[in-house]
Amino acid sequence: PVLRHFEGARRRAEKKFLNGVGISTADFRAIDNDAELTAALKEFGGSGILKTRRLGYDGKGQRVFRNMDTGGFSGTCEAMGNVPLILESFVAFEREISVIAGRGLDGSIAAYDPAENVHRDGILHTSTLPAGISHETAAAAQAAVAKVLAALDYVGVIGVEFFVLADGSLIANEMAPRVHNS
């Protein structure tokens, strides 16, 4: 891919970009120390996923907090490597999908149908086509990816993961500036 204005694998910048073009993401907070983690976990009701802001895949560079009290996290940031982190709120989703699309130099866009992804232990286990979603949800996912490609003036292939909520609406999870592993 030819990358223009794309900070892929930088989760905070990615989520800010997605929100800026009107694509919803999970709530998130930048975390640089244990005090910020404690405050953000309190804000998110004691639950969330702490991730490194750069790199990390298949559950690597992540720590899950579920229904935790909001104290006693001393040393968490150090244990994560003292790197910039992001805490994402949990999303009550029915399934995860991904769309792989490409954009040409002329601005034309082609997108595959969404694949439905199932993970085991944080690692992608299966991707199924067609995804068990409505035509409207599939079209909305493809339109969101087209919006990303156009906003970035991106030329090449991209993969975008989404959480599908009970009402069929979408929450973007992450982008990959390449063919997605699904």
What are the language-model segments listed below?
Residues 65-160, 164-166:
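Internal nucleotide-binding/catalytic subdomain
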Residues 1-44, 48, 55-57:
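Conserved N-proximal alpha/beta basic substrate-recognition cap immediately N-terminal to
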Residues 168-170:
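Conserved protein kinase catalytic/activation segment
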Residues 176-182:
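Glycine-rich phosphate/pyrophosphate-binding beta-alpha loops
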Residues 6-7, 26-30, 63, 88-89, ...:
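Glycine- and other small-residue-rich loops at beta-strand/loop junctions that grip anionic moieties
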Residues 54-55, 102, 178:
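Short glycine-rich anion-binding loops that position phosphate/pyrophosphate groups of nucleotides
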Residues 51, 59-62:
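Rossmann-like flavin
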